Amino acid sequence: MTLLTYSRLTGVWFLAVLATVWAIASWLLPVDGDLARVGGYAENDFGWRAPQTTFDKNLFHVTTDLKDYNRYYDVVLLGDSFSCDQESRRFGWQNYFINRTGLSMIVIDTRRYWPQEIMESEAFKKFPPKLFIFESVERYLHERVAYFSKETPPPKKASPTALEPLFATAKPLGVAPHEEAAKTKPGYDPDHVLGHLGAIFQRRTHLNNQVLEVPLAKPGLFSSPNDRDLLVYFDESRKKDLKESDFSDLRSGISVFQKIIESNGITKFVLLIAPDKTSSYAPYLKNPQDATVNLVAEVAKDPSLPVPRTDKILTEAIAAGIPDIYLSNDSHWGSHGHRLFAKAIADFLGAPDKN
């Protein structure tokens, strides 16, 4: 083979690859969901199609730097991706909660800061909030909370003054959300194509098993073209290893966590659990062994714990046939799921509802 022939063949090969990438780019929708992105699943198959209800701007402040927490907020929320990573979509549950209650809120990432760091911060001591919310996805709940069962809470201080009711002066904002259509135009992004193909290769060769495809027994639970399979993170199955003693430690840990937060005599504590897909959609899985334990129900065996039944309000909506309570391409909820999650805590706290 001459150098000229080799150069021509290389050029033809390069053009063929370029044409293939561009052809895929003209078909592949922009990446939207974390499960689709990590697992190498196309938004063309798993992207949501029904409109989602969004706000023009977020009503809460998220920080990844504790230095930003330097003034009074009615609510301090320490949470994970269900609270911190939903800003771009503008339908995070905090928007619905704040819109209904009028309370001010700062959101801090629990993947960066331990609860103890928040409690020991100058702002928390100087400007104690009316409400402290700890939010965790279900599959990481035990490791994030059960260890508190070994702690000894400090004695509760007497409040220096009569505590004002949580919603005494708060006024609903009355912001009107609006519907936003799904993005169904190709992204024409070669970098996305290469990343997508790389993720597919890793999944097919079992180099990356972070996302699992679980078959569903019931279609119509999602508005995506593929509504026959449930995408989930593999580590949802970690709950299958939990025993009754772990559930007991979890309940005890929540109780101690509450006593620690409320020891200042001012702040009320609530723990929010974001249920996993494999527990929320358990009745609709083709293989029952794919379902995982409902930790919200396990925690609720102690009715004294300040834990709203977020599981019930979500599963009731799923049973009613409302699609996209969770998004097919994502581990998080659609706008309706976020709204219901906000309703669960607002109702639990006795927030006025003028709607």
Model-based region annotation:
Residues 1-355:
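Extracellular glycan-modifying ectodomains
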